[in-house]
Amino acid sequence: GGYGGLCKTINCLCDFGEYHIYDMEPASRLQEKYLSNFKIDGKVFHHSEPEELKDIDLLISNYAYSELGEKLQDLYYNNVIVNSKKVYMILNRGQVSREVFLKRAEKDFEVTVEKVLDFWPPNGHLYYTTLIRK
């Protein structure tokens, strides 16, 4: 989500047919306004709820998943993450929340976790997490 900068950057680097952004409605309006200033080759979809998508090539989540409540995490995992071939995530919540997610993901994905930074109190660490569908 954010302001739409990742969508614009990916559009400059590669072709895509569809790009789906999950975010709150006010953020979606900002993204639409920002992206309207550029020629985006693929179709951009904005979702405020984790609607089910199938056959996702790549999912990128920079902090968003770890900032959702448990109910939304469940919906997002079951409707979006599990239907992705590859997932790249930055997780920034405490160890318990991260471990719950990783244990869940291990049944569906090959999981790689790399600790990047040791500076984020009270969470302690910042992690890059890569998932590849089994």
Question: Residue locations for each model-derived region?
Answer:
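Core SAM-dependent methyltransferase catalytic element
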Residues: E114-K134
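Conserved S-adenosyl-L-methionine
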Residues: C12-Y19, S84
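Conserved SAM-binding loop of SAM-dependent methyltransferases across substrates and taxa
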Residues: Y3-D15
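S-adenosyl-L-methionine
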Residues: E32-K54
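Conserved SAM/SAH-binding beta-strand->alpha-helix loop
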Residues: M24-A27
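Conserved beta-strand signature within the Rossmann-like core of class I S-adenosyl-L-methionine
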Residues: S84-Q95
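A short SAM/SAH-binding and catalytic strip from SAM-dependent methyltransferases
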Residues: D57-K71
